[in-house]
C-alpha cells in the first residue's frame, strides 16, 4: 500500500505519529512546505517531497490512501481548503482529513478558550494581546464546513476535539 501525507514535516510532536507508528515506513510519502532536512533525519526510509498540499506534485491515483493530519486549517481560506481536498481526492483512492473542531470551546493551537468564536477582528486583537499573531492565519472548520469542502460523499466523524473526514 502506498500512503501520501501532506504536511509531513510539522513542528508539533503529534504531526508525525503516522511515520512513528506505521510498520512499513518505506511505503510512506510525506509532503511539506520545508526542505525536509529535519524530517529526513528523523525518518530516513520515508520519502519526503517538498510541495504545496493544494497543488500536489503526484499523478492521479498515485496513492492508495492520502492522510492529511491537521493541515487543512493552515492552508488559507475556503478556496485553498477546497483545493487541498480536490488534490487529495485526485491523487488518493481513499482520503482521510483531520482538523481541530471549530466548535470545541478551546482552540487547540492556542489553547485559548472561546477566542476563536469571537468576531474575527476581536479574535485577532485577542491573539495579538496573547502574543500569538500566527493564530490569525488559522481557518478552523466545523462539521458542516468540512463536509462542504468535499464534492461527493464523505463521512464526518466528530470526535469532539477534532473532526475526521473520510471517503
PLM regions with names:
Residues 152-162:
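Conserved S-adenosyl-L-methionine
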Amino acid at each position: 500500500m502506498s500512503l501520501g501525507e501532506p504536511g509531513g514535516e510539522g513542528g508539533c510532536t503529534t504531526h508525525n505519529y503516522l511515520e512513528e507508528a506505521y510498520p512499513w515506513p518505506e511505503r510512506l510519502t510525506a509532503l511539506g512546505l520545508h526542505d525536509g532536512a529535519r524530517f529526513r533525519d528523523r525518518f530516513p526510509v520515508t520519502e519526503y517531497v517538498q510541495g504545496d498540499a493544494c497543488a500536489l506534485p503526484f499523478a492521479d491515483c498515485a496513492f492508495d490512501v492520502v492522510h492529511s493530519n491537521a493541515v487543512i486549517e493552515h492552508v488559507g481560506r475556503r478556496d485553498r481548503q477546497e483545493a487541498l481536498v480536490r488534490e487529495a481526492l485526485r491523487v488518493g483512492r481513499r482520503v482521510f482529513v483531520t482538523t481541530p473542531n471549530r466548535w470545541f470551546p478551546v482552540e487547540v493551537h492556542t489553547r485559548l478558550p472561546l477566542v476563536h468564536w469571537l468576531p474575527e477582528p476581536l479574535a485577532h486583537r485577542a491573539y495579538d494581546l496573547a502574543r500569538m499573531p500566527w493564530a490569525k492565519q488559522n481557518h478552523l472548520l466545523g462539521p458542516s464546513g468540512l463536509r462542504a469542502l468535499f464534492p461527493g460523499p464523505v463521512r464526518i466523524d466528530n470526535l469532539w476535539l477534532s473532526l475526521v473526514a473520510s471517503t
